[in-house]
């Protein structure tokens, strides 16, 4: 009897070692996401008769605020990892080793997408007000690139051996080195590749959003803001399920891996965002009907 056995294994966190400078996969993937996102957003901006240069203008502040928000969100809920003996970490730069506060070491992993969304949204709101751009239309232009960036960025978790799920023996199981396993699962070798689940789910959302974007000017059903609401609904739906598999959740009133006695923060936020998306679509439809009634009246 032939038994198929296979598993996924990270080759390591280093993408390129130049001797004087080490480039990690996490940073490389973020850079790739930014470049692709810039290209996609400019294309979508042209389709809505919005100056593509606005995308280039907002990019620096969007990146900075998103990273700050994502890191701050994670550090706040995982402060025990960045305090006491872990307050500082080593950074090799030009053949020198320096000590920096560990909460600044974003390249080592430890960011939360919900925090990044909050930071990015604040940047977008300020930019749209300063440029007098329609907020909902501009967010609809950026959202497809954001979810595509999330899809690409999730692979950073793979290379860092982090954000994996509970033990499994499925054919697509992920091997995790013993030093990266939670104490509760120290004797298990294979885990759910939740990074892969979320990456694939996010890419499907990207395709859906692009489809809706191309239909947006052809029907009143997809008003400005619809794509943003659809993103909140679809992403939150998938994230809620995937989060339930993970062994490293940010917890409220509990401890990983199962947040016993508490709740998983990402699932709580997902419920809120899912509901917000539904409410948003309801009001968009209500406004559409109101406009039609005024025209017919």
UniProtKB/Swiss-Prot annotation:
Membrane topology listed for this record: Multi-pass membrane protein
Transmembrane segments: 20-40, 50-70, 105-125, 133-153, 193-213, 225-245, 266-286
InterPro entries per UniProt: Lgt
GO cellular component: plasma membrane
Protein location: Cell inner membrane
PANTHER family, per the entry: PHOSPHATIDYLGLYCEROL--PROLIPOPROTEIN DIACYLGLYCERYL TRANSFERASE (PTHR30589:SF0), PROLIPOPROTEIN DIACYLGLYCERYL TRANSFERASE (PTHR30589)
GO biological process: lipoprotein biosynthetic process
EC annotation from Swiss-Prot or TrEMBL: 2.5.1.145
Known pathway: Protein modification; lipoprotein biosynthesis (diacylglyceryl transfer)
Name by which UniProt lists this protein: Phosphatidylglycerol--prolipoprotein diacylglyceryl transferase
Family: Belongs to the Lgt family.
Function: Catalyzes the transfer of the diacylglyceryl group from phosphatidylglycerol to the sulfhydryl group of the N-terminal cysteine of a prolipoprotein, the first step in the formation of mature lipoproteins.
HAMAP family xref list: Lgt
Keywords on record: Cell inner membrane, Cell membrane, Membrane, Transferase, Transmembrane, Transmembrane helix
Residues reported to bind a 1,2-diacyl-sn-glycero-3-phospho-(1'-sn-glycerol): 154
Enzyme class: transferase
Domain of life where this protein originates: Bacteria
GO molecular function, one term: phosphatidylglycerol-prolipoprotein diacylglyceryl transferase activity
């Amino acid at each position: 009897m032939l038994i198929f056995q296979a598993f996924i294994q990270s080759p390591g966190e280093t993408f390129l070692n130049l001797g004087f400078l080490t480039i990690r996969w996490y940073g490389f993937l973020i850079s790739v996401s930014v470049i692709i996102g810039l290209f996609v957003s400019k294309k979508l901006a042209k389709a809505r008769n919005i100056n593509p240069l606005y995308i280039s203008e907002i990019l620096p502040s969007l990146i900075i605020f998103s990273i700050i928000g994502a890191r701050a969100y994670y550090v706040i809920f995982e402060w025990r990892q960045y305090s006491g003996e872990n307050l500082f970490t080593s950074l090799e730069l030009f053949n020198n080793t320096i000590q920096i506060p560990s909460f600044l070491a974003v390249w080592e992993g430890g960011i939360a997408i919900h925090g990044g969304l909050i930071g990015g949204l604040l940047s977008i709101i300020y930019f749209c007000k300063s440029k007098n751009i329609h907020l909902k239309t501009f967010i609809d232009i950026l959202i497809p690139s954001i979810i595509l960036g999330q899809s690409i960025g999730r692979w950073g978790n793979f290379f860092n051996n982090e954000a994996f799920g509970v033990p499994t023996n499925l054919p697509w199981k992920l091997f995790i080195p013993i030093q990266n396993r939670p104490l509760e699962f120290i004797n298990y070798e294979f885990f759910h590749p939740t990074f892969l689940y979320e990456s694939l789910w996010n890419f499907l959302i990207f395709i859906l959003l692009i489809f809706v974007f191309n239909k947006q000017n052809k029907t009143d059903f997809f008003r400005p803001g619809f794509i943003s609401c659809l993103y909140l609904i679809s992403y939150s739906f998938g994230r809620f399920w995937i989060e339930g598999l993970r062994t490293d959740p940010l917890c409220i009133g509990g401890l990983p891996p199962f947040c016993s006695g508490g709740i998983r923060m990402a699932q709580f936020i997902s419920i809120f965002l899912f509901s917000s998306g539904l409410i948003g679509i309801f009001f968009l439809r209500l406004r559409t009907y109101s406009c039609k009634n005024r025209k017919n009246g």
